[in-house]
Amino acid sequence: MEYDGFPLSADQYERLTTDDLMQLLTEGLSDNPALAEKEPKFVLAICHMLNDKAQINAEVRRRRTFAIISHPDAGKTTLTENLLLRGGAIHLAGQVKARGDRRRARSDWMKIEQERGISVTSAVMTFEYKGVICNLLDTPGHEDFSEDTYRTLTAADSAIMVIDAAKGIEAQTLKLFEVCRLRDVPIITFINKIDREGQDPFDLMQEVSDKLALDTAPMTWPVGQGNRLKGIYDLTQNEFISYKQGETPENTGLSVTSNEITRFLSDDELTTLKEETELAQGACSPFDLELYRAGALTPVFFGTALRELGVDELLDAVASFAPPPRPQPSSARDISPDEKKVSGFVFKVQANMDQNHRDRIAFMRLCSGKFKRGMKLKLSSSGKSIGVHNPILFFAQDRELVDEAWPGDIIGIPNHGTIRVGDTLTENEDLIFTGIPNFAPEILQRVRLDDPMKAKHLRRALESLAEEGVTQVFKPQLGANWVVGVVGRLQLEVLAQRIEAEYDIKVAFEQAPYETARWVDSDDAAELKRFLDGNVASMAEDRDGAPVFMAKSAWEVGYTEEKWPKIRFSAIRERAPAAA
């Protein structure tokens, strides 16, 4: 691969973009017409690289990896069901709180999720729609599980934000939006539940614009709402989609100027529709693909997921203009999807998805290259290579072995605890994907075991569940009790139920003598040792063995920081381990 004209290594050539390779080859042949004759292997190798990149790029362009975010009860799970229905992943859409023979929401597979009708863990579902491969990440809506949601958003290239038409933008929606903004994740807005009485659509558009500091581009518009709902109007196609309660929405193909539209709308309704759509298009921004993908503009769709109105238009938008897989930041460089070597990162580990097998699945977002079943990948946390022999694609609990996968795909890797959240897997490259955080817990509780004979089993259970990254586990330097750290109290309930259901161990939680925790480190090793030795009663280790300062109050954190200026106290810790 090397000669005097282009003295680069093979790896460096492979990292070049398609345009750069084409320019290199064109200029090389132009400057030296005899290049192909003198260096046939070099020219052939460049041509092979171009062919490989073309194959990868063709698959990348077909993929949309997106998350759905919302406040609890905004209708996210119902929307998820309807998207899956349209993608052929399921054949019957059911309500979350099902009765009789109606099915539970397919993405809510954990027992407590089924009982409460909320998502507390991120489900990954893959389906095809109009030739586009959709990788849908159904994130937890409950605020106690925001950390899991944050990590899931690191794997998404775009997001659908679901807003309740009656309630507008709620607290959790705003928090999740800020996470998307930090990562420059473009957002499509779906204003849901227009079959109920809600806020004025202009007020909702203004709220999105004001609270999120985004330009808004209306793509569909409601024709009435609540009992007066007659459908939606597709502003991009100038078509009226009719709705009647109890019937499937019908795309009439009629514009507001068509005489036949009066079969569906009264004169007053038609006049209102004309006035509102004209005002909406005049007052709001036109859709701009570049602004949307830059995170500066959100296209807005109206509908009701429960009645299946507006869902087709939303999914068409995802397929048409949501971004394909993007370059991902790493410790070495931004990794382009069309790089030949395979790379990916683990944003989630789920234990015991199958009660019969006590399994542990690592969810890996592929970032570059063509993945093939059976290939060996280097694990950043250990530096060792592991064979990926049984990679799987997901639909809730349903699994399917996959022979190949491409950038943007989410594959599951069964393992016995060797792969952890934040791990990078590469085709023998020394790099680490960045931006997968661990947050300091807001609630700390001691674990009380009813049966002391099961202490070893409890340790295994806690370590296994901690690998999922939602619940954190700390071992104090003094005392025998484990301490768990969570964001909200619902997590404690989930933890206790899962330990009992999956490990047959009954536990209870009691108040720990700590209020908060901070990871500590220092550039001065001697100073760090003095701090650790002088604060043994307040020190613990997390599951990675990192030292953690357990404080009785936020005031104590501040006081200790002033007392030990050379020690760093961190509320957020990067989960990616140091490369071996």
Please name every model-derived segment.
Residues 21, 39, 46-47:
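Generic L/I/V-rich hydrophobic alpha-helical segments across diverse proteins
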Residues 13-25:
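Short amphipathic alpha-helical heptad-repeat segments
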Residues 6-13:
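Short, charge/polar-rich alpha-helical segments
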Residues 1-2:
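Intrinsically disordered, low-complexity linker/tail regions enriched in Pro/Ser/Thr
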Residues 49-580:
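Structural and coupling elements of P-loop NTPases
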Residues 29-38:
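Charged, low-complexity interaction regions
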